[in-house]
A protein has these predicted regions:
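Glycine-rich phosphate-binding loops of nucleotide-dependent enzymes
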Residues: 5, 11-531
């Protein structure tokens, strides 16, 4: 028996003739894994084999059971049935500590970090306590430099953006020197250049024998990186393939049963400015924030303007200033439909026609313990009477409409927000704001964590909103997404905003260079300030 297996409880199924012993060479084997919840079967008879040194993709639409399956492997969720082998030895992993003892590390879609302590302290909690905090801090700095993941070990987690939190999770997993590494959407916060560098590292890890389970909705990444793929639909395995021999279209058919709709992005008819930001400069709210320096931005009716950039370069601070969470700006620095709004609270800005989708799903986008119907009330008040009474029937009907229109997999309008998968909650939050038919929509990471079919629908809805005369500002780290739906692009770096450039004239290489703040020399001819 492997030394790290000492003390682990063996599965009862190992004594059953129904499950023959797997090949001893396999790093991980799952057989007949089933997990039931009161309203749904998350996994049904799932079988999966991962070889040493293999980069194995797990594909599936939102709610297909991917995250539940990964949590079972990592010991966070107990299966109702099925067997698991690690390096040929049958095991039942009762908790993440036992998983880490087996050499299994995971980066979750929803992060497991304590807000009130520092990055280094969070990482230290999951490592061998024989290391001092100072040694862990040095290791974080070295690993961050090696992988191009900019992070300060001394920062409290509550000061980090969502993208920066994901970097912490990636570094924490890599510091455990895993033999099986589970990555859930690991590149959503990286520049194209950093993605390439991460892929070099992952291939090196695989060449050294580390197995990698890779969950991503970026089909081109899976085809470029992975050598095996298991597809889930409705909690069941529907296919196994070699993604290097598949096209994006064929992978989509395996995953959602059809090819995603093709967007037709025609030039829009722009109207009057609905958002104007003029010389916006704000000092950081805390020592770990980013100063905003001379931001000039304009979004007109009938256009989609995108802001690209690596997370942590001032996007959060800008979004707070635009949404009304930060009201320190002079009134005239932010104009909504011509009205000074820099000092207005979020509710007053909604009266002017602004709707906003934050990057944080739970906490800012939705209240975890409230139903989907009641979460509509965060930004919609038409079902509240003057006396404060709720029209519950109308509220539930409206929530049901969003659920149906955006194909949200949930137990109905009364389902609490925290019961949804990350992708399905994202669809509901984005759908809630789009269905309100705003004058101005500001959306951060509109398709973060959603499957290709849902992403295509959300992007189509954004373009339809634009064609109806809405002004849309999209902040995203998905360059493919920005190129697909935006009419103009900006890049944010170190608290400054680049000139805008017509999307048709932009390239991935140019935008990648601008992410480093190198736009002064390039901002000629094609680039222009939209102010």
């Amino acid at each position: 028996m492997l030394p790290q297996l000492a003390g682990l409880r063996m599965t009862e199924a190992t004594n059953s003739i129904l499950h023959a012993a797997p090949p001893a060479s396999a790093r991980l084997v799952l057989s007949g894994i089933t997990k039931r919840y009161p309203a749904v079967v998350a996994n049904s008879e799932v079988s999966l084999t991962v070889q040493p040194g293999e980069i194995h993709a797990v594909l599936g639409e939102n709610g297909a059971g991917k995250s539940t399956l990964m949590k079972i492997i990592y010991g966070s969720v107990k299966p109702d049935a099925g067997s698991m082998w690690v390096d040929g030895v049958p095991v039942s992993i009762r908790n993440p500590q036992e998983a880490r003892a087996l050499g299994i590390s995971m980066v979750f879609q929803h992060f497991n970090l304590f807000d009130t302590i520092t990055v280094a302290e969070n990482v230290w909690l999951g490592l061998d306590k024989q290391l001092t905090l100072a040694e862990v801090t040095q290791s974080i700095t070295a690993k961050a430099s090696e992988y191009g993941l900019d992070i300060d070990p001394a920062r409290p987690v509550h000061t980090l953006s969502v993208g920066e939190m994901q970097r912490v999770e990636i570094i924490r997993a890599l510091l455990t020197q895993p033999r099986l590494l589970i990555l859930d959407e690991p590149t959503s916060v990286l520049t194209p250049q950093a993605v390439d560098k991460l892929f070099v590292v992952l291939r090196k890890l695989a060449a050294e024998g580390c197995s990698i389970l890779y969950i991503s909705h970026k089909l081109h990444e899976i085809r470029a990186l992975c050598t095996a793929c298991t597809v889930l639909r409705g909690g069941k395995v529907t296919g196994v393939c070699n993604p290097t021999q598949e096209s994006n279209a064929s992978l989509s058919r395996l995953m959602i049963g059809a090819e995603p709709q093709q967007l037709e992005h025609r030039p829009g008819q722009t109207g009057r400015p609905l958002l104007q930001v003029q010389a916006l400069s704000l000092a950081r709210l805390d020592q770990f924030g980013v100063d905003l320096n001379g931001i000039d931005l304009q979004v007109c009716a009938g256009e989609v303007v995108g802001i690209a950039g690596v997370s942590g370069n001032g996007q959060r601070e800008l979004l707070y200033a635009l949404s009304g969470e930060d009201v320190r700006a002079a009134p005239g620095m932010v104009l909504i439909d011509g009205q000074p709004a820099g000092a207005l609270a979020p509710q007053r800005r909604r009266v002017l026609g602004l709707h906003f989708v934050p990057e944080e799903r739970l906490g800012r986008g939705a209240v975890p313990t409230m139903s989907l119907a009641h979460n509509l009330l965060l930004t919609r008040t038409e079902h509240v009477s003057c006396g404060g009474w709720l029209n519950l029937n109308a509220l539930q009907a409206q929530a049901a409409g969003v659920i149906a229109r955006f194909n949200v997999k949930a137990g109905g309008p009364q389902a609490v927000a925290k019961s949804l998968s990350g992708g399905n909650l994202q669809k509901f939050i984005v759908g809630r704001e789009i269905a309100a038919k705003p004058k101005l929509l500001i959306v951060s990471q509109p398709t973060w964590g959603v499957d290709v079919g849902a992403a295509a629908q959300i992007r189509a809805e954004i373009l339809a909103l634009r064609d109806a005369g809405c002004a849309v500002l999209v902040v995203s780290e998905e360059l493919d997404e920005l190129f697909e739906i935006c009419d103009r692009l900006h890049v944010m770096a170190q608290g400054r905003l680049s000139p805008s450039i017509a999307t048709q004239q932009a390239t991935v290489e140019l935008v990648g260079a601008w992410m480093s703040g190198l736009w002064q020399a390039a901002a000629t001819g094609d680039a222009h300030v939209a102010a």
